[in-house]
């Protein structure tokens, strides 16, 4: 078995050469059996694959019985330098009997970003035409995709598959604004299972024309995403506007093998509360309630910091705090009662972002540390 966890990472400006049988992802290629593969709280930005096939970001190639979990990631302007007849996905699922959970991710592409305004319509369409989808599932192998709480804006298409059988697809509470229903799967139908699917073209008969791209460009803002990546976090993300239809529109829970794949926290450490889960990697927090953001220093009750590789928790109140250390995906790694000061051995903790959740019976404080 092969087990891989990738967290709090940024993959930017990578380019893979011509597609071959040994390459399926421009950034990450996973090939294994009977293992677990996790990518969380990461951003894939401006990566490209020189191919008519493969994937612009992540490829599962010839593996089997792999359980994959992709959550709280941002896929931003990844593309292909090839000339595909359809679209090249950010995520490619091949192999057999793999179960892939894709939850609370943000997929964004500005179709005109690399085009020249002086180009003719035909030349511009050559640029636009070679754009990407979100996920492509191979037609054989009995793979399963659970696609939940994702926002897809500006890509050519969302979930595609060349076959109606030999795969399991479940789509729930996704918000998609795409060019066309290319390879459209019925599981992502607009209005079904909380899904929203808006397309700039009614059908994908013939090549897109300039008017189709104009329609999609006009639709880009409808999801209420801030178009530029935010830089106030180690991992860049696309923030959400207050009036966005993504706010509170996500599913609280979706179980795969009795495990909830909806992450407990968003990409910056904000707690997702039942009944108020947003779609996408980022959880909107109203300016009037900033204490929901992990890592804020607004409270004088508790101080959390890293010293000599250890996590130090200082309680500045008379009441004891019940303190939990939680990984960004919700897994608890330590718990204790803190009356005054506690020093947690960093060598016993996983590296990366940890959320320190403290509760004294009357208030809860969440802070973020990085080991």
What are these regions (language model features)?
Residues 2, 15-19, 26-31:
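Solenoidal tandem-repeat scaffolds enriched in leucines and small polar residues
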Residues 7-8, 22-23, 30-239:
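Predominantly extracellular beta-rich ligand-binding scaffolds that present long acidic/polar faces
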Residues 72, 104, 149, 243, ...:
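Residue-level recognition of short loop/turn positions
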